[in-house]
Amino acid sequence: MFQLDLKSRKSIYEQVIDNLKELIMTGRLAQGEKLPSVRELSKTITVNPNTVQKAYRELERQGYVYTTSGVGTFVADRDEIRADARELAAAKGAFDEAFREFLFLGLSYEEAKAIALEIMEERRTSNDQD
């Protein structure tokens, strides 16, 4: 379910957010589905409950989830989830950096493009199987 890399430059908090976003955007966490409680998730992924709470608050701020007091945190309607301009710019920058790395490694533009399309197709196929 979660992939946390303790050696990553990204904080654990950011990695928790990224993992949950991916689960939501790929449909593995369905609209209206209740997320594990802060305590449950922190125990499952062995992180501090404050880290999970902070991630849940940020996901709520971004519109990925909503919280009902005393009931829990739930996945928001995917059709209403919109990445903000900052996130889109960051994702585009990461893609650009990876693409330039392919070219730096000596691949042609067409070879790099083929790899990008292959990765996108693999992602789509794995999402279809879930």
What are these regions (language model features)?
Residues 34-45, 59:
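A short alpha-helical element within helix-turn-helix/winged-helix DNA-binding domains
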Residues 13, 37, 71-88:
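Short, cationic-aromatic polyanion-contact patches
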Residues 1-34, 40, 89-93, 99-126:
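Extreme N-terminal segment that seeds HTH/winged-HTH DNA-binding domains in transcriptional regulators
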Residues 28-29, 33, 61-70, 76-78:
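Beta-hairpin "wing" of winged helix-turn-helix
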Residues 44, 61-64, 122:
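Residue cluster at the C-terminal edge of the helix-turn-helix DNA-binding motif
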